[in-house]
């Protein structure tokens, strides 16, 4: 029951409250930059997609922590969720600075990620960890692509994305070391297809 209450609290905080980071944003010490209208529009779209990714991460980790009966794994999942909360706060701060807003479909993204996390976790802890590994690897690849697309002048956004990518790679490595099972190719393909729908939609809405 305590875990379910924690998950419900996380959902409410993720979707309806302004997230509080435990660590200052990597962009905090950087000066404001003067971007053109087109540059600002592109940065806003990419950071909105990144914010959606962090909303999904909260749903995924919370679902998995609700199901596992392994205290150490639950602790590790909740620790990863706290780090993802930093990312959530940083991307929201950057969206505010760019004069933009999060995706209007965040409740849908969170619910979908939570449902997928529940399904993966009910198979086994190892399968759940395998899902984490694949998710974090795909997110890392998306972030690398965003680093190539973000305007060179947008140093604050680039600093945030660079730090996020390094954190996601570490999360994948930790899940792998904890005994993750590799996902079958069809599952990886479905995840990529779902991510494509999400990123394309969040880019605009």
From Swiss-Prot:
Binds 2 iron ions per subunit. Fe cation 2 binds at residues 84, 136, 168, 171. Keywords: Cell membrane, Iron, Membrane, Metal-binding, Monooxygenase, Oxidoreductase, Ubiquinone biosynthesis. It is found in: Cell membrane. Pfam families: COQ7. Its EC number is 1.14.99.60. This is 3-demethoxyubiquinol 3-hydroxylase.
